[in-house]
């Protein structure tokens, strides 16, 4: 293998290739299909943001377009912020970004219990003037990229079948994941903890950690999860409401879930029609947030659900395609991880609103209201698009 090929495989580029005027821009075009899918999901999310939020926005903000305008504003800002990275960023620069993002997210998670804003009895947000961010969301991206960097750097040691393989392939990645999980748990963010844990295990598995260690960790995590539920009163309350939904207080802890199920059940095959939801009139609380999927079901019916789920499925398939053809292992693991993150959050949100799992307060990517979350989601897709420019597939 010549020096140039070796540098490409390691995600490192020579000074000549970095600074040459002819190569100033990233070398190829972005993956067009992935870009179109992201645009389609975002447009769908924009439309449903207005439809689901109009009544609530009129009641509390005297402006039915309040959340819609926020969505458009943050979407435009996200695109403007992300576009330069897509065009200019090179794989070795994303490696530097991974280290910085992991350090920043760890620091922010440490600050949440101290200066975080409390909503619903939990501290998950930090405000910087008019903008609020959820550090656990940044931590998910940071963990994916940092583990991708680590697993690609120590690939040979991870592949060892002895103690070295356990130390480099299991112990250290587990510590990196576990630290963020513990810090997230301090903010009473169970869904964030679950996703961070699953992302960590996913990257470890794809990155080459032995299956026996993965299975052992899954067993330990399951035991730890049961213990947490027994120890934490708020977690136990949600689990008991989920198990005994028919006996739970329909005007109290079970209200949101039951009203969401009513919305889903009333949609039928074709739905009531866009904008014609009944449940958004104060029945489903803040319908533009975590339970926006129920409004999609009610207004667009089963056909609308198939379209939404189909778009997310296409995004996952195309994301995996980009990951498979990425220029090096770091880029590949990063694309796999960021794609899996979207898939996990989508599946968990749908599972919550359909009462297949306890209500954990998890948003539907690209649909649920939240400016900083939307900007981060667009940026994540931008990372994948940036890497797609270096695809090994000839175009």
Language-model features and meaning:
Residues 1-25, 347-395:
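A juxtamembrane structural motif centered on a specific transmembrane helix
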Residues 42, 49-54, 191, 277, ...:
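Short linear Ser/Thr-Pro motifs
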Residues 129-139, 186-188, 268-273, 362-376:
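Glycine/serine-rich anion-binding loops at beta->alpha junctions
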Residues 22-38:
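N-terminal membrane topogenic signal
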Residues 47, 118, 123, 267-269, ...:
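Gly/Ser/Thr-rich beta-alpha loop segments that engage phosphate groups in nucleotides
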Residues 245-289, 293, 300-304:
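TM-adjacent membrane-interface loops and short helices in multi-pass inner/ER membrane proteins
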Residues 39-43, 51, 58-256, 294-355, ...:
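Hydrophobic alpha-helical transmembrane segments of multi-pass inner membrane proteins, especially
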